[in-house]
Amino acid sequence: MMNHAVARRYARALFELAQEKGLLDQVNRELELVVSMYETDSYLRAFMNDQRISPSQKRKVLASVLEGKVSPLVLHFLYVVVQKRREPHLPSMYRAFQDLANEAMGVVEVEVRSAVPLAEETARNLEAKLTTKLGKRVKLRTQVAPELIGGLAVRVGDTLMDGSVRTRLRRMHERLISAQSNVIEG
């Protein structure tokens, strides 16, 4: 298993080059595309993670698939990752890069979980309110979690604001149990 420090080292190297060339936002988007393909395409992931396939073969495939779709900077970064046999750790490298890029661009990532998909207008309103409250640009990551029953659970960094129906029901249940035990004891 790769150390997070190594993922951060790769991310920092790419971040510094992207920032130096003024391509931070573009590289962030391109890396997101590549990692999304890696995470969702099981054939691509199996190919990339297969240690029997040489780095030069992987580079040829990457070039044929990504050339013209991503910047030379991202393509070269992927070549280095392949050469060093760090392919399975691409998602953690991306997350570390994204953290650095968000910090540099004054963006805070907010995870919003809801029982049903958020309407576009609701998402925009929530984003605007959070931007005002946090004083930073907000990037919403929405996720549908039917187990919440209703309401929202919003995570900003290590802070969770849980307004879900499930949590309200759990708290109500705890209060009822507590009140019932007080009645029995009294």
From Swiss-Prot:
Gene3D superfamilies: N-terminal domain of the delta subunit of the F1F0-ATP synthase. One of its GO terms (molecular function) is proton-transporting ATP synthase activity, rotational mechanism. It is a peripheral membrane protein. GO terms for cellular component: plasma membrane; proton-transporting ATP synthase complex. Pfam families: OSCP. It is found in: Cell membrane. Keywords: ATP synthesis, Cell membrane, CF(1), Hydrogen ion transport, Ion transport, Membrane, Transport. Its main location: membrane. The keyword Cell membrane applies. The keyword Cell membrane applies. F-type ATPases have 2 components, F(1) - the catalytic core - and F(0) - the membrane proton channel. F(1) has five subunits: alpha(3), beta(3), gamma(1), delta(1), epsilon(1). F(0) has three main subunits: a(1), b(2) and c(10-14). The alpha and beta chains form an alternating ring which encloses part of the gamma chain. F(1) is attached to F(0) by a central stalk formed by the gamma and epsilon chains, while a peripheral stalk is formed by the delta and b chains. PANTHER family: ATP SYNTHASE DELTA CHAIN. Belongs to the ATPase delta chain family. F(1)F(0) ATP synthase produces ATP from ADP in the presence of a proton or sodium gradient. F-type ATPases consist of two structural domains, F(1) containing the extramembraneous catalytic core and F(0) containing the membrane proton channel, linked together by a central stalk and a peripheral stalk. During catalysis, ATP synthesis in the catalytic domain of F(1) is coupled via a rotary mechanism of the central stalk subunits to proton translocation. HAMAP family: ATP_synth_delta_bact (MF_01416). This is ATP synthase subunit delta.
